[in-house]
Amino acid sequence: MLCPEKLTTYCFKSGQVNELTARLIGMAFTSANIFDTDLPQPLTLNPWQLTPMLDFPLKNKQGGVIENNGVFALLHQEHPDWPLILQSGNDFNEVYVQLIQRLEARGMRYVYLGDLDSAGIQMADQFARLLKQTQAEEVAALQQPTDVRLWLADLGKIDARRTKQRKVVSPVYQAEMTTIALFWKFIEQEQLMGVYEVRITEWLEATEV
């Protein structure tokens, strides 16, 4: 058990969704039900709390990584037992990167969910490239290229600025980036909440250790 006075927490009040500030996201690691502690969830770790958490006991060895903090908050509110990790902004801060890589080395399995626009796909690709033992196809398991094509056709919004081609490395994300650029359409995470709830449930059941 961690001492509350030594660990910063971030809690959501029942019936209300509060989002973390961009400044806090940019310097911290926020997760729910990843570490085996009885402190309120979600849990936000600051840089000076990194070292003791690298080997802290785990509650789960699965983590759904969510790009947008509003969607993270909604999913946690509706499914308070799900293991979730908030993507740490665009800068991939040092605390976040070290914990993501250390958790993977300890057996953590990840799946990534983000906006289906150029920036979101690039961020997903960057996350996948942090990992040493996990293929990008596994990270993209719940948002595969075939899914992206179908969702863009049904739900996509036209925006040339948000669909410009950007450089990505992983073939799975190259395919998704190409599709977005060809369609000139994007999708925000909030539009896929119903899909997320079904797919995350199935993924957690299929990958449970």
Predicted regions and their residues:
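Acidic beta-strand-to-loop metal/phosphate-binding motif
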Residues: M108-D117
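Nucleic-acid enzyme cleavage-core boundary/entry regions
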Residues: M1-S88, F92-E104, A119, D125-Q126, ...
